[in-house]
From Swiss-Prot:
Keyword Transmembrane: yes
Keywords associated with the record: Endoplasmic reticulum, Glycoprotein, Membrane, Transmembrane, Transmembrane helix
Membrane-traversing stretches: 30-50, 71-91, 101-121, 132-152, 162-182, 190-210, 232-252, 262-282, 304-324, 337-357, 364-384, 393-413, 425-445, 497-517
Cited CDD domains: MFS_Azr1_MDR_like (cd17502)
InterPro entries the record matches: MFS (IPR011701), MFS_dom (IPR020846), MFS_trans_sf (IPR036259)
Bilayer topology term: Multi-pass membrane protein
Protein name: MFS-type transporter VdtG
Compartments reported by the entry: Endoplasmic reticulum membrane
Glycosylation (residues): 4, 122, 185, 329
């Protein structure tokens, strides 16, 4: 251990000096320095995960404050559009510039967006702030994993990946509780202001403790740097993603799917995304997504797996609380408490699997086994009825959440394992792009199924207009009908929610198929290879090596 809190790495076997092209060994931070860096990263990750759910219970007060009922959809969509659209561009930026400064820039953008939201004088300013915060989040989300990639040895990363899974599950579940606490006791503006001091703490810890080698752009002319960012590809990708998400957000709710606006958006999205694929095939390694990375077996399977597991996670995370509120007459706060079996089980499974993978090295068995548990648990959750008692809704949650916790984080670990270090930021960004896009698409699918099935099931109840179903919260549905129709009302809500849960069953089964295509790679193999080995410190594709991320070679 040296005086800087980093571990000194030994030279090649036999005590020989590092040979030509091997480069010096990398020094990973240890002890207090490492823990400080990871704390900063976890705080930033917590904020981005929290920001996606904390606003849910605050929206009614915001719309009352600004008299902006027509803008409700934009409070979530503005954040989501920039969050998804810029994920892959940030991956390219991380692969070319020093991740420390890219990450800090993303945190600063997120903080600016949060400050604008908190101080917003009108609804338009709030929407702009949400879009800026989403842009910052797109760099934080994958950036925290990319920095972990450069600060933690591969064989130890499963532990930190497991902790990240706990953070994500906790933030996603407690967001509505925190939002409700601020909204009811202080002000909805504190749903955004809380990000400022926590984000500042992240900035301080990363500034003080994270030190990375010089960026690959050193000595590269500015024009060449801009060309490395694939401007043509991103001019196709970013508008294409925005058009796709707008069509998904508006289709079936604001406008009919056959409406000219939706059709035009879908056609434009298709044309732009096809053009993006063409640009990537033309540019090859100089593109935003090198085709060889996309064709890597574990990356392709990992993206499919991530889309499917996120679909199930979002379905239950959003609609299971609605079941508790509508069917079990739970308050918003109490429904959050009733979700604790999911939070605790997924967190424990994620952390335990991290330690086990650290010991045994293989992550693929946990993806396969976790997918099977998810499929079984999701299937059992579709058996809920208005009379289902707590032993079942607790036990079925636990079974599904254990599978989710076992498997959800492993695709990003696979990207770090199978790719050489120059490609790792791109691979990690692809996984997180799949997560954000999959969640967005399937939430829209769930919402369409839920709304249509609810209207079909409850349309025959006397004196129950369609507007009452869409404008009444789940906690107040019992006030919509006379007592003699309450059973039909609850049965209709239950049936509509079970149809949504069946989407999660299908996606969980698809996870099993995707996981079966993952390669069986051992994260401990890189440790055994030692410094100078392929992908290892000082070796080809490794930090300090001739083809490493910091090596200065052109892409």
């Amino acid at each position: 251990m040296n005086g800087n809190g980093t571990a000194d790495k030994p030279g090649p076997p036999g005590g020989k000096p590092f040979g030509p092209g091997m480069g010096p060994p990398i020094q990973y931070p240890t002890g207090f320095k490492l823990y400080s860096i990871m704390t900063g990263l976890y705080l930033a990750s917590f904020l981005t995960a929290l920001d996606r759910t904390v606003l849910v219970v605050a929206i009614p007060q915001i719309t009352d404050h600004f008299n902006s009922i027509d803008d409700i959809g934009w409070y979530g969509s503005a954040y989501l559009l920039t969050f998804c659209a810029f994920q892959l561009l940030f991956g390219k930026i991380y692969s070319f510039y020093n991740p420390k400064w890219v990450f800090l820039s993303a945190v600063l953008i997120f903080e600016i967006g949060s400050a604008i939201c908190g101080a917003a004088p009108n609804s338009t300013a709030l929407i702009i702030g949400r879009a800026i915060a989403g842009l910052g989040s797109s760099g934080i989300f994958g950036g925290s994993v990319i920095i972990t990639f450069f600060t933690v040895p591969l064989h130890q990363r499963p532990i930190y990946t497991g902790i990240a899974g706990v953070i994500f599950a906790l933030a996603s579940s407690v967001g509505p509780l925190i939002g409700g606490g601020f909204t009811n006791n202080v002000s909805w503006r504190w749903c955004f202001y809380i990000n400022l001091p926590v984000g500042a703490l992240t900035v301080v810890t990363i500034l003080l403790f994270l030190n990375l080698p010089p960026a690959r752009k050193a000595g590269t002319p500015l024009r060449e740097q801009l060309l490395q960012m694939d401007p043509l590809g991103n001019l196709c990708l970013i508008p294409g993603i925005i058009c796709l998400l707008l069509a998904i957000q508006w289709g079936g709710s604001t406008y009919a799917w056959s409406n000219g606006r939706i059709v035009a958006l879908l056609v434009l999205a298709g044309v732009l995304l096809i053009a993006f694929v063409g640009v990537q095939l033309w540019l090859q390694d100089k593109g935003t997504i090198p085709p060889r990375v996309m064709k890597q077996r574990s990356i392709a399977a990992g993206m499919a797996f991530t889309i499917c597991v996120t679909a199930g996670f979002m379905s239950f995370n959003y609609y299971l609380p609605i079941w508790f509120q509508a069917i079990k007459n739970a308050s918003s706060f109490h429904s959050g408490v009733m979700m604790l079996p999911t939070v605790i089980s997924s967190g424990v499974a994620s952390l335990a699997c991290g330690f086990i993978i650290h010991r045994v090295g293989y992550y693929t068995p946990f993806m396969i086994g976790g997918s099977v548990l998810m499929a079984i648990g999701a299937g059992l959750l579709t058996t809920f009825t208005p009379t289902t008692e707590h032993p079942k809704w607790i036990g079925y949650q636990v079974l599904w959440a254990l599978g989710c916790g076992m498997s959800m984080q492993q695709a990003s670990l696979a990207a770090q394992t199978v790719l050489p270090k120059p490609d790792a930021p791109i691979g990690i960004s692809l996984i997180f792009f799949s997560q954000s896009l999959g969640g967005s698409v399937f939430l829209a699918v769930d919402d369409s199924i839920y709304s249509n099935r609810l209207a079909a099931k409850l349309g025959s109840i006397p004196n129950l207009p369609q507007s009452a179903l869409t404008n009444t919260g789940a906690t107040n549905i019992r006030n919509l009908v006379a007592p003699q129709y309450l059973g039909r009302l609850l049965g209709g809500y239950n049936d509509a929610l079970m149809d949504v849960f069946r989407v999660a069953v299908a996606s969980s089964c698809a996870c099993v198929v995707a996981a079966a295509f993952m390669e069986w790679k051992n994260v401990r193999a890189a440790k055994a290879a030692g410094p100078g080995g392929p992908g290892g410190p000082g070796g080809p594709g490794g930090p300090g090596g001739p083809e490493g991320l910091r090596g200065g070679n052109k892409v």
